[in-house]
Amino acid sequence: MLFSATMPGAVVALARRYMSKPTHIRAQDPGDEGMTVTTVQQVVYRTHALNKVEVVARILQAAGRGRTIIFARTKRTCARVAEDLAARGFATAALHGDLGQGAREQALRAFRNGKVDVLVATDVAARGIDVDDVTHV
């Protein structure tokens, strides 16, 4: 048996290679069409890579913004974005795999307690984050 929360191509290939007649079971609510919750608003901002931090900083200035999580592809980018936003006056913390367990817990604790309202994380490090009142991702 093989269980996976997600089914990226590598997992599908693994199942096809080593399993006989694998069955893909998808857990889904009836009527759920894979769309986001109706209360979620999705917006896309197209910008040049060199302007990303500037655009993010402007978005973070939105009125009524609560806790915000920003995802970065690499550990280096995660640390750089957190540093750049902190230099612009935002209360930020970075969360990535190069941090020790104590530093990761401290960053999450500060985010949960409101001392930091912007958490910049890699997707791997961010798994399992459960924080209330996150308004922007």
Regions inferred by a protein language model and the residue ranges of each:
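Conserved helicase RecA-like core
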Residues: M1-V137
